[in-house]
Design a protein with these regions (language model features):
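A short acidic, Gly/Pro-enriched loop at the edge of an enzyme's catalytic core
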Residues: 193-201
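Hydrophobic Val/Ile/Leu positions in short beta-strands of Rossmann-like dinucleotide-binding domains
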Residues: 147-148, 203, 226
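NAD(P)H dinucleotide-binding glycine-rich loop of Rossmann-like/cofactor-binding domains
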Residues: 86-149
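Glycine-rich beta-strand-centered segment in the early N-terminal region that forms part
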Residues: 22-38, 50-92, 121
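Mid-domain Rossmann-like dinucleotide-binding core that forms the NAD(H)/NADP(H) cofactor-binding site
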Residues: 122-194
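C-terminal hydrophobic helical "lid"/dimerization subdomain
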Residues: 1, 164, 212, 255-309
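Glycine-rich phosphate-binding loop and adjacent beta-alpha segment
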Residues: 208-269, 305-309
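Short, well-ordered coil/turn residues at beta-beta hairpins
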Residues: 35, 89, 202-204, 305
Length: 309
């Protein structure tokens, strides 16, 4: 079996080409992808070649962990999934490319247990479930968010989920293009905020130089949550010591986090409206990646695979 996939042959060298797929196992499903999102965090690092080394890292690779599509075939133990609309959090199914994280392809193979059923009506918004689950995972692991740093799509999801759970976070954003779009919370600049008693600060800016200024805004016993993706980080110890600060790293989401945000959406407590700002055909993947990483007006870029065989 073959598929057509986005392939990063090397940093900043992207192609759309056929790839061979591994054999289908009894517990697998074959998903025909309708939409896949482009991550401006991990995928940007893979695209630019600045991703810190980790086991399994290397090129060529198929990126993507934000795909949605329909189960069109399955192994003998998963026949009941055929016809389901599912969210695909990545796939490692290619014989001649690495799956990091493998979701940006027209057809993918993955274990049935990892393909999460979603409402077909979500359409391209279903590609946001990975980010929504990432935001929920960060919040569920600690104190409610009092301050969120960054009003990109992940920051907006953090804020919306916080409001849905009864919170009232403040949000900082330095780019005037991204200040608009708040519902149920206020967006401001750090220079207009003189608070220095935040119990919890969630950073989704990904900026490596944010720890010192954020620690300075904490109350005693406060927490800074690193919900972005960073290279090397450092901070001055005395201010953190004086505040007895906690620095927590929020890692990848779990299936329970996807289930939680899916329930919030189903109960009309969480809206994904206004977050997918750009949809491009998969055949225009090169231009789509450039726009996703370079255009501040692009909150979320989604590839449409409907015209790819």
């Amino acid at each position: 079996m073959q598929t057509t996939a986005v392939v990063l042959e090397a940093p900043e060298r992207l192609t759309l080409r056929p790839l061979a797929l591994r054999a289908v196992e009894p517990g697998d499903v074959v998903v025909e992808v309708d939409y896949s999102g482009i991550s401006t965090g991990t995928e940007r690092l893979l695209y630019t070649g600045t991703m810190p080394a980790f086991p399994g890292m290397g090129y060529p690779l198929v990126p993507g962990y934000e795909s949605v599509g329909r189960v069109v075939a399955a192994g003998s133990g998963a026949q009941d999934r055929i016809g389901d609309t599912v969210f695909v959090p990545g796939a490692n199914c290619y014989t001649d490319a690495r799956g990091l994280f493998g979701g940006a392809a027209r057809r993918v193979i993955l274990p049935s247990a990892k393909a999460m059923t979603v409402a077909p009506a979500l359409g391209p918004q279903a590609a946001l479930l990975a980010l929504a689950a990432t935001a929920y995972h960060a919040i569920a692991g600690g104190k409610p968010a009092e301050l969120i740093v960054g009003h990109g799509v992940l920051g907006r999801l953090l804020a919306r989920i916080s409001v849905a759970l009864g919170g009232a976070p403040a949000v900082w954003e330095t780019n005037p293009v991204r200040v608009a779009g708040a519902t149920g919370y206020a967006v401001t600049d750090a220079t207009a905020d003189d608070r220095r008693d935040y119990a919890s600060i969630y950073d989704v800016s990904g900026a490596a130089d944010m720890l010192d200024p954020l620690i300075a805004r904490l109350a005693k016993g406060g927490e800074v949550v690193l919900a972005g993706f960073y290279d090397r980080l450092s901070f001055g110890f005395p201010p953190a010591f004086m505040r007895e600060a906690t620095i927590r790293v929020a890692a990848e989401f779990k299936p329970a986090d996807v289930a939680a945000v899916t329930a919030l959406i189903a109960d009309d407590r969480l809206s994904l409206d206004g977050l997918v700002t750009h949809v491009r055909p998969a055949a225009a993947a090169n231009d789509a990646y450039v726009t996703a990483f370079g255009d501040a007006d692009c909150l979320k870029m989604v590839l449409d695979w409907s015209d790819v065989t």
